[in-house]
Amino acid sequence: MGQTNVTSWRDFVFLGFSSSGELQLLLFALFLSLYLVTLTSNVFIIIAIRLDSHLHTPMYLFLSFLSFSETCYTLGIIPRMLSGLAGGDQAISYVGCAAQMFFSASWACTNCFLLAAMGFDRYVAICAPLHYASHMNPTLCAQLVITSFLTGYLFGLGMTLVIFHLSFCSSHEIQHFFCDTPPVLSLACGDTGPSELRIFILSLLVLLVSFFFITISYAYILAAILRIPSAEGQKKAFSTCASHLTVVIIHYGCASFVYLRPKASYSLERDQLIAMTYTVVTPLLNPIVYSLRNRAIQTALRNAFRGRLLGKG
């Protein structure tokens, strides 16, 4: 008998953490700690920027939306993963898997476009500082944020439709800890070559288009920095971009490795490690690398806590 389509009545089952009970408990404690730090750090960044009028600038506007996007991304994946590590149900319904893939892909794509918008903001700040206020006006900033979110959701929807348009075979065990495109695609019946190509093209478009704008922005930024006569001035100008560059390199490096490879090169252990970095570690780097080293953010956080404590008193 041939393989049968069972997606209408059977759930998917995650096998990403089919290890010993002691190791699962250790992983649960580790990922719960990382998740709580990630969640609270990003929420604090959003609150600090919202409460401090000195941070109502385009750069911090984009940063707050990036923190919001990262928070939503982790909310769609990590709580479900922690439940599995704690001994909860490892099954997820067909609709639940599709929803998880849609939201995780949408937020991941949105992050790419927000990072591109942040790169453009740095370009205007360094290359045209006298016209920064007029160029980066509220209307343009709102358009960049809305476009990032809408485009991210369109690409996320496209990837989800490509995957769940396929028929799935009797094997319904996902060798992963969430419904990501490569492991779910590996469960499909028949020739998945065309679908694999479509996913590759969609991923390539997201990464290339956003990374192209970042590269162009930094090419102009580098040229402007090299024209600064003093080494101190060059160092100060570059320091405003260093955190953004760090996040870009890690974000795009992990995403390219996961999504821009053919199905034949999929490796369970290696891809789970990269996915862990992309899902758990990268969202934590945003507040640490990009924000918590920023004196303005630190001051805003202190003022917010001080105001709250005084209000209680």
Swiss-Prot record:
Annotated keywords: Cell membrane, Disulfide bond, G-protein coupled receptor, Glycoprotein, Membrane, Olfaction, Receptor, Sensory transduction, Transducer, Transmembrane, Transmembrane helix
Keyword tRNA processing (UniProt): no
Membrane topology: Multi-pass membrane protein
Glycosylation sites: N5
Any one of the GO BP annotations: detection of chemical stimulus involved in sensory perception of smell
Database matches in PROSITE patterns: G_PROTEIN_RECEP_F1_1, G_PROTEIN_RECEP_F1_2
Record-level Gene Ontology MF annotations: G protein-coupled receptor activity; odorant binding; olfactory receptor activity
Cysteines paired by S-S bonds: C97-C189
Gene Ontology annotations for the cellular component aspect, listed alphabetically: membrane; plasma membrane
Cytoplasmic side of membrane: 47-54, 121-139, 218-237, 293-313
SUPFAM superfamilies attached to this UniProt entry: Family A G protein-coupled receptor-like (SSF81321)
Subcellular location: Cell membrane
Transmembrane segments: 26-46, 55-75, 100-120, 140-160, 198-217, 238-258, 272-292
InterPro entries, A to Z: GPCR_Rhodpsn, GPCR_Rhodpsn_7TM, Olfact_rcpt
Location, primary (coarse class): membrane
Keyword Membrane applies: yes
Extracellular side: 1-25, 76-99, 161-197, 259-271
Family statement: Belongs to the G-protein coupled receptor 1 family.
Function as written in the Swiss-Prot or TrEMBL entry: Odorant receptor.
Name of the protein this chain belongs to: Olfactory receptor 10Z1
Species whose genome carries this gene: Homo sapiens
Lineage: Eukaryota, Metazoa, Chordata, Craniata, Vertebrata
Gene this chain is encoded by: OR10Z1
